[in-house]
């Protein structure tokens, strides 16, 4: 089952653009720029947007048709954004570079969404779906991860060296099954299909593949994280919960998601921050020990797009909107 975007981390947990290496001792911390992808509703439809340091950077669509920006990746001063724009009949998967459309990945004949973007070696990798098929695009060239006989979706893509990892789900005829693909082929099957489950985020360190998502226990959705094939984190199952984004620094595993409608961050299986009593934590990045999260919080009858730093609100981006992906670049 394709999950509502208001509660999905469509973006992959993003690395800091300068790499994973920690700052050298006694070095002066560099200033950073914080990029966020999401949407704002200022009329009848959602407009795809990118913010930089709390201010609107790009309005990717004009708001005349429904659109979302679900993932952002910055490299070499260029801002790549993945999402979709409705054509009046179906959703069309798209990638933008800076404020211009770069790729229209699908022709609009079937519903399609680009959920995650990752740029490596001047190649643009995008994960998503078209129709019932989970897909991975390299620039504009598509690879079908599934055969289309059952519903499937690729939510997250991560490139590590020459390996391209994609995470999502494929239905087995009864329930959705968590899967990770590597170089376009099935790599890990993380649930047995007895209950619905999905992966929303994949993060790779060396040979270790971390996957975040959820698995139903039959009555409630349980937030889960797997390291390779082993489950390493789960909520207690008393409330609906999901792990939307995972980020790893050394031996520390950070997770953003929600439990019982509360936006939360966990670190090494323990709750670290309770961000909002009625909200969702969609994407997480850790930089120089600081924890940055993009998501949304319900305020009155609407949801507001937010960024938190170390558990405290840093930016309110849109009074009516949502934030799905965060990316940090050192200046």
Where are the language model's segments positioned?
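Bacterial Sec-dependent N-terminal signal peptides
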Residues: 1-8, 13-33
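Residue-level hotspots at or immediately adjacent to binding/recognition sites across diverse folds
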Residues: 29-331
